[in-house]
C-alpha cells in the first residue's frame, strides 16, 4: 500500500509513478490517511476513526506587512535551483526553462559500501595522530633542498645494475611477457645499447629467457620516464636532497622523435644513447661538478612563473638549466664539435628538465617516506598494465589497480583504438605537487593533454585542492592568485 506525493501537474510525472506502482501490484491511495486505513483493513483489523472534537472558530485581526522583495521574486519568477544529487532532477527543472546548477558531488568512494567503511575507520582511528603524521610528511617536502650533484653512469650509483644483466623499468613490478609492446621495445633497445645482442631477434630471445632481471626503478631510488627502461651504462642525473642526505636518479631526456622511452630501438635510437653515454653525460657531469651542484628549487620557482607545470611543459626550466651550465661548457677543454652538439641538443630539447624534475620529486618524496605514519601518497607510477601508489604509513607496499588509457591529441590517422595504456614513473611530479596538479600554471598545453582550455585547467587545479592537505609556499603560481602548488595527496 502506498501513496504518491505531488499532483498531476508535477514535473516528475505523477500519473506515471502511480501507473508504475499499480503495475507492480501496489495499492495506491490518494492520501496517507486512506493508505493507513487500507493497510490496517488488509491485515484483518477493524478501525474506527475517533470522533473529532469540534471547537468554535476563533478569529483575530493581524497587521498586514509588506512582503520582502526576495519573497515576491520567488513567487513571481521562475525558480533558480542548485541541485545536489541525481543529475536527472536538474534535467527536469532545466527542461521547464528554469535556471539550474548541478552541484558536482558524488558519494565517497563512488558509493562502494566497503570502501566507505574503510574511510570511516580511517577518520575515526587515531585521527589526530594521522593528521599530525601527515603534517610531518608535508613539512619534510617543504623543507627539502634538492640539488643536482652530478651525471654519472647508472651502474656507479645503483649497485643492482652490476649484478648480471639487469634492466630497471617504470611502475610497480611486472614480468617481461606482461609488458606492453612499447615497454618491451624499450627493453630491446637497452639490450642492443648494452651489447647483449646484435639484433632484435637476439635481444627478444635473451629478454624472454629469464636471463635478464627486471627491477622497478622505484625499488632502487630511481625513476624512469614512459617505459622507464634504465640499464647499467646509461647516464643518470644524481639529485641529492640535502635536507635529509638521500639521493635519487633518473636517465636524461632523449629529445623528440624516435626515442627509447616510447619503445623505439632503431640504429638512430641506439646511436643517440651511445652519444649521451660518451659525450652528453660526461660533459654535463663535469659542468655540474665544477659549479658545486645546482639548486633545483630556484629553477622550479622561476619556471613555474614562466608557464611550466613540469610534466608536459618544461621549456622555461630547460632553458633556465641551459643558462646555468652553458657558460661552464663554453670554457671546458673539449672537442669543439662535441661542445656545439651538447649546447644544440640542450637548446632543442624542450622537455630536458622533466627528467631532472622526476629525480627531484623522487629524492624529496623518498625523504618524506621516512615518516612511517600517515596517509600521504609518496609515489604514483604506471607500467602499462597497473597503476601503483605508495603511502607514507604503508612502507614499501604497492597498492595497484588496472591502469587507465590517456586521453590526448593523436597524430593524423590514429585514434583511441591505437593507444597504449598509461606508463611511466613521471607521475612522481604530481606526487610532488606539480605536473597535472599545477595545470593552471601552464594553460598553453591544456589542450595537448586532453583538457579543453584555461577554465578546464583552473577547474582541475582547484579540484586537486580537495584531495591535498596543504600548499607549497616555495612554488607560487602567478595566474592562480599567487597561491602555492597543491601539496600532500591524502589517500583518505
Question: Model regions: which residues?
Answer:
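Glycine-rich, charge-decorated loop segments at or immediately adjacent to ligand/cofactor-binding or catalytic sites
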Residues: 3-20
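Anaerobic metallocofactor- and corrinoid-dependent redox/one-carbon enzyme cores
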Residues: 7-9, 50-492
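Short, hinge-like loop/turn segments at secondary-structure boundaries
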Residues: 18-21, 47-48, 119-120
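Short, structured coil segments at secondary-structure junctions
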Residues: 22-25, 96
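Short acidic-hydrophobic, aromatic-tinged amphipathic segments that line or gate anion-handling sites
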Residues: 27-38
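Short, hydrophobic alpha-helical segments
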Residues: 39-47
Amino acid at each position: 500500500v502506498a501513496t504518491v506525493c505531488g499532483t498531476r501537474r508535477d514535473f516528475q510525472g505523477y500519473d506515471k509513478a502511480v501507473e508504475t506502482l499499480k503495475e507492480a501490484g501496489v495499492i495506491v491511495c490518494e492520501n496517507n490517511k486512506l493508505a493507513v486505513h487500507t493497510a490496517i483493513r488488509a491485515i484483518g483489523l477493524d478501525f474506527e476513526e475517533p470522533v473529532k472534537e469540534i471547537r468554535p472558530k476563533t478569529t483575530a485581526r493581524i497587521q498586514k506587512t509588506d512582503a520582502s522583495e526576495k519573497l515576491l521574486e520567488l513567487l513571481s519568477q521562475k525558480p533558480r535551483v542548485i541541485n545536489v544529487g541525481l543529475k536527472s532532477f536538474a534535467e527536469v527543472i532545466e527542461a521547464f526553462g528554469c535556471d539550474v546548477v548541478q552541484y558536482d558531488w558524488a558519494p565517497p568512494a563512488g558509493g562502494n559500501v566497503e570502501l566507505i567503511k574503510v574511510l570511516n575507520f580511517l577518520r575515526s582511528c587515531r585521527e589526530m595522530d594521522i593528521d599530525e603524521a601527515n603534517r610531518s610528511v608535508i613539512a619534510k617536502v617543504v623543507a627539502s633542498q634538492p640539488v643536482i650533484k652530478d651525471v654519472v653512469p647508472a651502474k656507479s650509483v645503483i649497485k643492482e645494475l652490476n649484478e648480471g644483466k639487469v634492466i630497471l623499468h617504470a611502475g610497480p613490478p611486472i614480468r617481461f611477457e606482461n609488458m606492453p609492446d612499447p615497454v618491451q621495445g624499450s627493453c630491446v633497445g637497452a639490450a642492443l645499447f648494452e651489447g647483449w645482442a646484435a639484433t632484435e631477434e637476439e635481444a627478444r630471445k635473451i629478454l624472454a629467457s629469464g636471463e635478464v632481471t627486471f627491477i622497478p626503478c622505484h625499488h632502487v631510488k630511481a625513476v624512469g620516464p614512459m617505459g622507464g627502461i634504465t640499464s647499467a651504462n646509461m647516464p643518470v642525473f644524481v639529485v641529492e636532497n640535502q635536507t635529509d642526505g638521500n639521493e635519487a636518479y633518473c636517465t636524461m631526456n632523449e629529445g623528440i622523435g624516435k626515442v627509447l622511452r616510447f619503445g623505439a630501438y632503431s640504429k638512430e635510437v641506439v646511436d643517440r644513447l651511445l652519444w649521451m653515454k660518451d659525450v652528453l653525460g660526461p660533459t654535463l657531469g663535469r659542468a655540474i661538478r665544477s659549479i658545486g651542484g645546482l639548486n633545483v628549487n630556484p629553477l622550479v620557482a622561476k619556471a613555474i612563473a614562466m608557464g611550466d607545470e613540469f610534466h608536459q611543459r618544461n621549456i622555461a626550466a630547460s632553458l633556465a638549466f641551459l643558462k646555468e651550465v652553458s657558460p661552464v661548457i663554453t670554457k671546458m677543454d673539449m672537442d669543439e664539435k662535441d661542445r656545439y652538439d651538447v649546447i644544440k641538443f640542450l637548446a632543442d630539447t624542450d622537455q630536458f628538465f622533466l627528467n631532472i624534475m622526476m629525480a627531484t620529486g623522487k629524492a624529496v618524496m623518498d625523504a618524506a617516506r621516512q615518516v612511517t605514519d600517515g596517509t600521504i601518497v609518496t609515489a604514483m607510477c604506471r607500467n602499462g598494465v597497473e597503476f601503483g601508489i605508495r603511502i607514507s604509513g604503508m612502507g614499501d607496499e604497492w597498492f595497484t589497480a588496472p591502469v587507465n588509457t590517456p586521453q590526448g591529441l593523436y597524430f593524423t590517422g590514429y585514434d583511441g583504438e591505437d593507444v597504449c595504456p598509461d606508463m611511466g614513473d613521471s607521475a612522481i611530479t604530481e606526487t610532488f605537487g606539480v605536473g597535472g596538479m599545477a595545470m593552471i600554471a601552464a594553460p598553453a598545453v591544456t589542450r595537448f593533454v586532453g583538457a579543453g582550455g584555461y577554465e578546464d585547467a583552473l577547474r582541475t587545479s582547484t579540484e586537486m585542492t580537495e584531495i591535498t592537505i596543504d600548499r607549497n609556499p616555495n612554488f607560487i603560481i602567478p595566474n592562480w592568485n599567487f597561491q602555492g602548488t597543491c601539496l600532500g595527496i591524502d589517500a583518505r
